[in-house]
């Protein structure tokens, strides 16, 4: 007796090899897949900005990586918990601006050097909801538990999501 449905998939012409370079951007799914690939000795760069869920944050992270952006103190904000970037996961936060900037710029520099040599780029989007700062309209990748009154929340339509993200490659 068979207790599961078996699905036969055709073999792909192109397969990921251990010698390939892989970069992943996006949600916790990208993080988990990337960590599994690393555990199995694949050459991966996983989420250079940390986990990002919405398509616009992922697109902006890729744009910043391609342009070799360097962060400075004006790109950060400070609260009682330390220094943070709205574009980065909390793992990049620091007790000082210098500590936070060192983590961000070191990681971004590695990703910027790696991206042009990448054979596979994997992108996962976790939500169509986008948060932006009310004060300047900039999309954020992480709210860092800041008050919701600082942000505007909006739902991206399918056409707008695909159109905006496709601009990454133009």
Label every PLM stretch briefly.
Residues 67-111:
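A basic- and aromatic-enriched beta-loop-alpha substructure that forms the phosphate/nucleotide-
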Residues 124-150:
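A short mid-domain helix/strand-loop element embedded in enzyme catalytic domains
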Residues 93-98, 102, 142-161:
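Surface-exposed cleft-lining segments at the edges of enzyme active sites
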């Amino acid at each position: 007796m068979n207790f599961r449905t078996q699905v036969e998939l055709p073999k792909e012409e192109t397969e990921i090899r251990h010698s390939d370079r892989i970069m992943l951007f996006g949600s916790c799914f990208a993080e988990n897949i990337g960590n599994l690939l690393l555990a199995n000795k694949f050459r991966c760069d996983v989420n250079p900005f940390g986990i990002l869920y919405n398509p616009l944050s992922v697109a902006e992270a890729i744009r910043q990586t391609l342009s070799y952006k360097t962060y400075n103190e004006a790109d950060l904000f400070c609260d009682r918990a330390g220094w943070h970037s709205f574009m980065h996961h909390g793992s990049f936060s620091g007790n000082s601006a210098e500590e936070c900037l060192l983590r961000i710029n070191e990681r971004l520099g590695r990703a910027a050097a790696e991206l042009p040599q990448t054979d596979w780029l994997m992108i996962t989007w976790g939500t169509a909801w986008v948060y932006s700062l009310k004060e300047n309209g900039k999309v954020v990748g992480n709210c860092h538990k800041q008050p919701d009154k600082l942000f505007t929340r909006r739902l991206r339509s399918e056409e707008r999501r695909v159109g905006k993200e496709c601009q990454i490659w133009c």
